[in-house]
Amino acid sequence: MTQHSPAFVTPDWLEREQLTDTPTPVFFGWLFNQQSLTRRLDRLSDGGFDIVPLSEGWQALRDDECAALGLPAASEGWVREVYLRGNGENWVFARSVAARDALQHGGLHMDELGTRSLGALLFSDPAFDRGTLQVCHYPQSWLPDADAVSGLWARRSQFSRGALSVLVAEVFLPALWNAIHNKDHA
């Protein structure tokens, strides 16, 4: 489970039009691509893609997550944190959350995913609508210790189906950018 730092100010999640600190064109293309990240990573890794679960369970959601899901502060939800890996390297840290009430009545069993991709599940169900992508520099204190680096770009979006909403945040780790660079220059 990632660290909680109550003294840390919640980052500003910004939509494309609100960005003043614009990432490079390659970063921008990955951050705002609407396709399944799982599929893109699988292609980039030439089939060497896998998921490593880090933690999952019921816990109090972060303030920014509650606000995005329209919940009261400190609402409880299911939190799933995983690495999306390519060829044995951690490429993306992902944190997915859903409110307890919505999840228990929404027919999505996040607790049964194991090493399966939540993204693949969400993109295979046409009833899920994806909200607007937002980006930020993800707080270092919210990352697993092994990848706790400041200034990493992250994106998040909300997937909704009826009363069920799942907020998915994806932090792009340095090894991913290295893999993209190496593939572009191969």
From Swiss-Prot:
Entry similarity comment: Belongs to the UbiC family.
Cellular compartment(s): Cytoplasm
Annotated binding of substrate, by residue: R80, L118, E170
GO MF annotation list: chorismate lyase activity
Classification via InterPro entries: Chorismate--pyruvate_lyase, Chorismate_lyase_/UTRA_dom_sf
This enzyme's EC code(s): 4.1.3.40
Enzyme class name: lyase
GO CC annotations on file: cytosol
GO biological process assignments: pyruvate biosynthetic process; ubiquinone biosynthetic process
Keyword Lyase: yes
PANTHER family: CHORISMATE PYRUVATE-LYASE
Designated name of the protein: Probable chorismate pyruvate-lyase
Pathway: Cofactor biosynthesis; ubiquinone biosynthesis
UniProt source species: Pseudomonas syringae pv. tomato (strain ATCC BAA-871 / DC3000)
Pfam families linked to this entry: Chor_lyase
Purpose: Removes the pyruvyl group from chorismate, with concomitant aromatization of the ring, to provide 4-hydroxybenzoate (4HB) for the ubiquinone pathway.
Catalytic activity, reaction form: chorismate = 4-hydroxybenzoate + pyruvate
Keywords recorded for this protein, A-Z: Cytoplasm, Lyase, Pyruvate, Ubiquinone biosynthesis
